[in-house]
């Protein structure tokens, strides 16, 4: 059966068709935008470098001075003949990669470059350590502390790259470029700071193990095997 439609009906059908076409075009455009953003994430660059530094030695401080420097002044029976001081550094640079859709929607991933290491690594040996036997034993103990610092940072740098690539390979979406820019540093720090904290906790645990009663007893046995000290030290 043929039906005659009024002009108003045709206009309504035409308007509906145009809306459908517009929605289809917008959907296709959005899919294309998201595909571009995914490729952006796959291209993000992450580098982590361990910056080593030579370990210096200082024998100019007295036992009393080293005790003050170590902060262990509360124990009158505890003498400090050796001390290790590390100055760790953890820095990073972040650069945004983003794409902006025709409607202003923005996706972003960061390029991240991390440098971790030490601005200084010093071991102090008490001035009172005059004979080479005792001095070498104390030096070995302090070098063990320095080695633990460096090993944790060196291994940490190697282990960090893959988790960072995973964390920063998934683009985030924002209503505008301004909104994306505001989230750049919080995003990076939210990923990097927990790692830095875990790294320092691991180092602290290793340092405590080196200074454990078992470790100190081993050092004492070695010291007792040294020839008698001329100045009565250790």
Question: What is each stretch, according to the model?
Answer:
Residues 114-134:
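Short, charge-rich amphipathic alpha-helices with coiled-coil/heptad character
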Residues 26-28:
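Boundary at the C-terminal end of the N-terminal hydrophobic targeting segment
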Residues 131-144:
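Short alpha-helix carrying the canonical HExxH Zn2+-binding catalytic motif
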Residues 52, 58, 63-114, 168-234:
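Metalloprotease/metallohydrolase-associated module, dominated by Zn2+-dependent proteases
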Residues 30-48:
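Short N-terminal segments immediately surrounding and downstream of signal-peptide cleavage
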Residues 143-160:
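Catalytic Zn2+-binding segment of zinc metalloproteases
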């Amino acid at each position: 059966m043929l039906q005659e439609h009024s002009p108003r009906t045709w206009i309504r059908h035409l308007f509906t068709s145009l809306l459908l076409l517009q929605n289809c075009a917008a959907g296709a455009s959005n899919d294309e935008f998201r595909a571009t953003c995914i490729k952006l994430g796959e291209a993000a660059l992450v580098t982590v470098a361990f910056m080593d530094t030579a370990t210096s030695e200082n024998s100019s401080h007295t036992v009393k001075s080293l005790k003050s420097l170590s902060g262990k002044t509360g124990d009158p029976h505890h003498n400090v003949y050796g001390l290790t001081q590390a100055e760790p550094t953890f820095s990073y640079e972040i650069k945004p990669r983003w794409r902006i859709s025709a409607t202003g929607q923005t996706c972003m991933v960061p390029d991240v470059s991390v440098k971790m290491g030490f601005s200084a690594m010093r071991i102090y040996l008490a001035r009172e350590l005059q004979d080479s036997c005792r001095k070498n034993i104390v030096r070995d103990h302090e070098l063990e502390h320095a080695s633990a610092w460096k090993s944790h940072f060196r291994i940490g740098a190697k282990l960090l790259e893959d988790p960072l690539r995973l964390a920063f390979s998934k683009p985030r979406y924002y209503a505008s470029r301004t909104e994306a820019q505001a989230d750049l540093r919080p995003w990076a720090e939210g990923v990097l700071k927990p790692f830095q904290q875990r790294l320092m906790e691991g180092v602290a645990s290793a340092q405590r193990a080196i200074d454990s009663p078992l470790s100190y007893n081993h050092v004492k046995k070695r010291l007792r095997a040294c020839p008698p000290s001329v100045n009565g030290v250790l």
